[in-house]
Amino acid sequence: MLHVAALTLLAVLIAPTPPDEQIPYDAAYRKAQEEKKPLVVLVGANWCAACRTMKSETISPMNSAGDLKGVIFTHVDKDVQPEIAQQVMQGNTLPQIVVFCEGDQGWKRFSLTGMQSERRVKELIRKASEILPLRR
């Protein structure tokens, strides 16, 4: 019985965090700095159909497949957190997927605007990750 409990706990600990249960922006930013990982922010709104679709049909499958394990992911609702959304976004189009990476020359911003496929988001994350210093 103890063996089953240990395996269950292990499965919970190593499973990716679903996008619906992501950490708040401020905590995600700190975690990205501490772990030297890209910060991926999906900016959207509940009323935005493309935002809901992108979250469920792009981000959620990527998370389930482990494609987000090398990044820190968070979601910012433009209506709930307008100040943070304004800082992160460029323009007013929703959704926006923004990736921040800290390289040798400081933080860089990469983004896509509008509904995006898994392929495009993966390409954006890969491109942003190329500026990360090599870990030894």
For the regions a language model picked out, list residue spans one by one.
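Electron-transfer interface patches adjacent to heme c in soluble/periplasmic c-type cytochromes
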Residues: 85-91
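Sec-dependent N-terminal signal peptides
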Residues: 4-13
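Short pre-active-site segment immediately N-terminal to redox-active cysteine/selenocysteine motifs
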Residues: 36-39, 44-47, 93
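Thiol-based oxidoreductase modules, predominantly thioredoxin-like and allied folds used
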Residues: 19-22, 59, 63-83
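Conserved redox-active cysteine motifs that mediate thiol-disulfide chemistry
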Residues: 43-57
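Active-site-proximal beta-strand/loop segments in catalytic clefts of secreted hydrolases
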Residues: 43-46, 76-79, 102, 114-115
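A short beta-strand-turn-helix
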Residues: 21-37
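Non-catalytic, surface beta->alpha helical segment in thiol-disulfide oxidoreductase systems
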Residues: 92-136
